[in-house]
């Protein structure tokens, strides 16, 4: 169920889509996520970017309509959402032109861990992104990072959370290598984020504020490979962690084999709760973050626009 509060009139075009989506419950709260970001950002004399997912052109347009400052998208290959519709090359050009016409930004994911068979094909795609005018390439693999530097030296690089950026020295190293932005690991605390900002003040920092969590550090899980032969680091994760499991611990001589139960007779050891940081957005911004990211390129338009509006 979508829950939000809007100050706009029903006839206001900027909220027209809201009232075409049901069910809708209006509640009494001070402001939406977008308004909260801008209000806090204004007090700090800086604009904090709201970065939204877009799995296709329709999702891109509605994300911008609902207040996103930038969108991240994937091409037909080389990204971690292989099961999404994504953007064909011609659609990427259309998407970039559309976003730029509205004064917004668009980042393209190149965040697979590349194998040898892909290295020869990446340069052409990278050059195309630079030619089209993409605002950045999101990269996780060190080899792909170097390819972007060589074949599109003016294309900004954002280092993906898949690179497991958990400390200030890693962030500084990426910055020294030429990265414009580093996307921190989801497992970071506010204190750690503040330390990174203090130690590396001259690089953009991006964090996830909403969406799915991985049971392991991003990219370090092999459940999908093991159970379904689908590589999570190549965009086809089966999300096996969300299956129902009965976990049994063995090897305890005093107790023997026994079920592992957390609550209500179930265990959630393989499935982290989804991330929702709305109550901490002000603290995240105060920690020095430049961009707040919503996960969900494969989610529905309804889900994505709800998360940007709540």
Report the location of each language-model feature.
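Active-site pocket-lining/capping segments in soluble small-molecule metabolic enzymes
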Residues: 41-165, 184, 192-291, 298-310
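Short, Lys/Arg-enriched N-terminal segments with co-localized hydrophobic residues
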Residues: 22-43
């Amino acid at each position: 169920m979508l829950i939000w509060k809007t100050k706009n009139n029903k006839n206001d075009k900027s909220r027209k889509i809201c009232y075409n989506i049901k069910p809708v419950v209006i509640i009494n709260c001070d402001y939406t996520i977008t308004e909260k970001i801008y209000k806090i950002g204004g007090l700090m004399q800086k604009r904090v970017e709201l970065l939204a997912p877009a799995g296709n052109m329709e999702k891109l347009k509605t994300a911008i309509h609902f207040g996103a400052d930038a969108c991240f998208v994937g091409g037909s290959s080389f990204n971690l959402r292989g099961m999404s519709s994504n953007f064909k090359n011609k659609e990427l050009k259309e998407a970039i032109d559309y976003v730029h016409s509205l004064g917004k930004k668009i980042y393209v994911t190149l965040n697979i861990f590349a194998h040898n068979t892909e290295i020869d094909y990446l340069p052409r795609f990278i050059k195309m992104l630079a030619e089209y005018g993409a605002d950045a390439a999101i990269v996780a693999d060190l080899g792909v990072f170097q390819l972007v530097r060589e074949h599109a030296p003016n294309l900004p690089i954002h280092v993906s959370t898949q690179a497991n950026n958990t400390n200030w020295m890693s962030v500084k190293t990426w910055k020294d290598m030429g990265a414009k932005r580093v996307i921190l690991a989801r497992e970071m605390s506010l204190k750690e984020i503040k330390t990174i900002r203090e130690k590396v003040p001259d690089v953009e920092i991006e964090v996830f504020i909403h969406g799915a969590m991985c049971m392991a550090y991003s990219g370090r899980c092999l459940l999908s490979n093991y159970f379904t032969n689908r590589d999570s680091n190549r965009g086809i994760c089966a999300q096996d962690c969300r299956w129902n499991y009965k976990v049994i611990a063995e090897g305890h001589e005093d107790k023997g084999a026994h079920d592992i139960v957390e609550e209500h007779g179930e265990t959630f050891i393989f499935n982290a709760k989804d991330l929702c940081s709305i109550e901490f957005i002000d603290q995240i911004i105060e920690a020095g973050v430049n961009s707040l990211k919503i996960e969900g390129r494969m989610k529905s338009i309804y889900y994505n626009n709800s998360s940007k509006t709540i």
